[in-house]
């Protein structure tokens, strides 16, 4: 965990990029299941 100045740790990038992706996938599948995502 040392020498992180000027360099973003990979796990932070994965977490920040993964949460919205998982959220969008969850909303998409929930919308498709409930019928609201039929227009997508």
UniProtKB/Swiss-Prot annotation:
GO cellular component: chloroplast thylakoid membrane; photosystem II reaction center
Localization: Plastid, Chloroplast thylakoid membrane
Topology in the lipid bilayer: Single-pass membrane protein
Highest taxon of source: Eukaryota
Record keyword Thylakoid present: yes
InterPro entries per UniProt: PSII_PsbJ (IPR002682), PSII_PsbJ_sf (IPR037267)
Pfam families reported in the protein's UniProt record: PsbJ (PF01788)
Principal subcellular localization: plastid
Transmembrane segments: 8-28
Keywords, ordered alphabetically: Chloroplast, Membrane, Photosynthesis, Photosystem II, Plastid, Reaction center, Thylakoid, Transmembrane, Transmembrane helix
Signal peptide extent: none
Swiss-Prot/TrEMBL GO biological process terms: photosynthesis
SUPFAM superfamilies reported for this sequence: Photosystem II reaction center protein J, PsbJ (SSF161021)
Assembly, per entry: PSII is composed of 1 copy each of membrane proteins PsbA, PsbB, PsbC, PsbD, PsbE, PsbF, PsbH, PsbI, PsbJ, PsbK, PsbL, PsbM, PsbT, PsbX, PsbY, PsbZ, Psb30/Ycf12, at least 3 peripheral proteins of the oxygen-evolving complex and a large number of cofactors. It forms dimeric complexes.
Function description: One of the components of the core complex of photosystem II (PSII). PSII is a light-driven water:plastoquinone oxidoreductase that uses light energy to abstract electrons from H(2)O, generating O(2) and a proton gradient subsequently used for ATP formation. It consists of a core antenna complex that captures photons, and an electron transfer chain that converts photonic excitation into a charge separation.
Family: Belongs to the PsbJ family.
Protein name stated in the entry: Photosystem II reaction center protein J
Organism: Pelargonium hortorum
GN (gene name): psbJ-A
